[in-house]
Amino acid sequence: MKTVRNIFGTGTLYDSPDLQGKIYATCAACMSVWSDFLSWANVHKERMVKSIEDADTIVVLCCQVTDLAVYNDIKVCERLNKQTGKSIFISGCLAQRFDIDLPDYIKRLDVVRVKNQPLYDKTLVHYEPPFWVKGFEETCETLSLKQGDLFRNFYPLKIGAGCNGNCKYCTIRHTRGEGYEMSARDQVDEFLAFDNVVLISDSPTVKQIKDWCEIAIENNKEISFRNMEPYVLVACEKEVVDLSRKGLLRILHCPIQSFDDEVLKIMNRNIPATKKAVEIMQEVRKSGTLVATNIIIDYVHNGKVYPNYYKQLLEEKFDYFAWNPYFDGHFDLKRAEERFDKYIV
């Protein structure tokens, strides 16, 4: 346990040694956060339980990308607390948000991860269904384009964490713990050992993408990329297109966030790179690569609302897209509940 100060204030964070006995863990966050704790769980497999009734300690991995996500996090914790009467440790991005008040039964846990650890057993950490998809049904498909299912059944190869970007709407650079970047050559054995590999990082670097394109071609093995920023895709255009033309790039996920130059400028995003990235994604589609993206809808700036939902363009340019409603970073439980009812229909 330690006292931590960050841009969100000062608070107490517990560490992995504070987790007692048998542990049940579930994830209501993204694959980056899920695979973090999963790496630790695979090292301490004998302590992980798959039934919450057998647990001494409960961990919920949480998100804070929108107030809807925070609201869902709280609801998951509330459900498990009522079910067991136990305190809940939360890890992931929400744990670092000391400005967001949480129920007394919740304890904040720092980022828990083991670098360069193969994830032999992905079932050690339960994955909550995507809250924005009502009636979500699990599948075993790896090429499902059903909402909320992208990469869900892939093998998450952890190549790093953290982001040095300065997008105005994003706080990842402050909530993901100490950032790191793995050398691709150090993870070749892991890449070869598992099927349906997707690279997992909050923001893969140019060097990582170029190296992994080379490795995939050397080994004639399919790979997928997630969270590749537009400027990275542009810098790696030749390598990515070559990989796709060889039939080895299965899915390319690149978050463009908007088609609108004005909105991109407000977001502090790279406008030329975004436009070029969309062009590159159309090029790799010709070779059979599936392309996916994220956007932020109802973006607010200086009191003006930008709907930012170009449905026809999104359906034309992408095989899969997901959206988040703009979140100003100030969490209010009542407002979050109202917005949850508005957007999750």
Where do the language-model regions lie?
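Structural recognition of alpha->loop->beta junctions
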Residues: L102-D121, A216, V240-C254, N308-A322
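Glycine/threonine-rich flexible loop motifs
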Residues: D67-V76, E178-Y180, E262-R269
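Conserved SAM/AdoMet-binding glycine-rich loop
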Residues: I88-F89, Q96-R97, L192-N302
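Cofactor-cradling patches in redox/metallo enzymes
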Residues: K2-K122
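Radical SAM enzyme [4Fe-4S]-AdoMet core and its adjacent flexible, acidic
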Residues: V206-N219, E316-V345
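Canonical Radical SAM [4Fe-4S] cluster-binding loop centered on the CxxxCxxC motif
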Residues: M1, G148-R185
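Aromatic/hydrophobic pocket-lining residues that form the small-molecule binding cavity
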Residues: V70-D73, A184-Q187, I209-W212, C236, ...
